[in-house]
């Protein structure tokens, strides 16, 4: 079994685990619009708010609860699902087909002049959309997540991009971190996913690096602040244990146009290393 399959199986087990006795899980539930809601008019791009409805009535070319996205299908199987009458036969059970197959299910009318990006952002991942892009940082010290560099300075690019949606399972974002100075290059590849209908959103990052470290980070997204804890580490025997933390927490949040990452790492003898980095966006992704 490959490392990717192992990490995926671990993620599924963590996300569908049975809650312990006495704990409560909160499910995201959308409330219907009220007269007061419609007075504030949350609908965008010419959409109409109607009391009693769950979403706005969108103008041509737009979709989403608030008409905030261009009208399009998210899944390539939408036309087939529509032929199988998936759009309406299970409408009372889920709104999956309404929001992910809006054109095929005739929930919106596309703009003929709009050229949609090849890879869309799945609606389930919209809480993470403000992290999308390529982010660059230049550090004056070797402090880094998950392991420090031996040099006293380095550069890093974090790339968070939409990924093709799977036929089954939760959608994800591609995640890549590249850090370098001279001949020392550290690369981390992985993906980010959210637990469906969780509130606040439960987030997981599964990653593997060219250092020989595989990780699972679990956390929550609250008020546009993503807090993650390392929940699983698989270490290659040849990896330098001196730079490997026993545990780590990192926090990502937007500060204006910048991305802030705050890290705390725990080492033996209760030694704690803390640092903060600021990233500037150098590229964006349309979705």
UniProtKB/Swiss-Prot annotation:
The chain crosses the membrane at residues 1-22. Residues 71-108 form the ShKT domain. Its main location: membrane. GO terms for cellular component: plasma membrane. It is a single-pass type II membrane protein. Glycans are attached at residues 174, 229. Gene3D superfamilies: 2.40.128.20, Laminin. Expressed in hypodermis first at the two-fold stage and throughout the larval stages but not at the adult stage. Detected in the body seams after the L4 stage with expression maintained in adults. Detected in the male tail structural cells at the late L4 stage and also maintained in adults. Detected at different developmental stages in vulva, PQR neurons and several neuronal processes in the head region. Disulfide bonds join 38-49, 43-56, 58-67. Residues 23-287 are extracellular. It comes from the Eukaryota. Keywords: Cell membrane, Developmental protein, Disulfide bond, EGF-like domain, Glycoprotein, Membrane, Signal-anchor, Transmembrane, Transmembrane helix. Pfam families: THAP4_heme-bd. InterPro entries: Calycin, EGF-like_dom, Nitrobindin, ShKT_dom, THAP4-like_heme-bd. Changing residue 108 to Y: In allele wx74; hermaphrodites and adult males appear slightly dumpy, with males having swollen bursal rays and much lower mating efficiency than that of wild-type males. CDD domains: EGF_CA, lipocalin_heme-bd-THAP4-like. The keyword Magnesium does not apply. It is found in: Cell membrane. Residues 34-68 form the EGF-like domain. PANTHER family: PROTEIN MALE ABNORMAL 7 (PTHR15854:SF1), THAP4 PROTEIN (PTHR15854). Plays an important role in determining body shape and sensory ray morphology, possibly by acting as a signaling molecule outside the expressing cell. The EGF-like domain and the SXC (ShKT) domain are essential for the biological activity of the protein. May function as protein interaction domains. This is Protein male abnormal 7. It comes from Caenorhabditis elegans.
